[in-house]
């Protein structure tokens, strides 16, 4: 729970990449954009499931930052969120939704409180 406080996320991710060994696992846990934790006054960034694509996808045309491979995205639910099962949703209907819990979070808020990104360093 540090990344959302950083002044320059791009520079910090480059530095993490620089000091890490090849194939190192980088785990970043941040508040989910639709939770109340995301809106603390000292937070500089908001994160959703697509936020780390800047650092993992080579086909971005407006900003290229190869060097990480996304291993896993874990949505950490609130107490209420645990009541909704993480059943997969059809990709053709909801291309940016990971599961039913994620969909309900868009609709109701406060279902997901944090996102856990796990990425491998590629050198």
Regions found by a protein language model. Name each.
Residues 1-34:
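Conserved SAM-binding loop
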Residues 5, 45, 108:
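Aromatic-acidic/polar surface patches that form glycan- and anion
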Residues 24-51:
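Conserved class I S-adenosyl-L-methionine
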Residues 44-67:
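Short alpha-helix
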Residues 64-123:
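A C-terminal cap/extension of S-adenosyl-L-methionine-dependent methyltransferases
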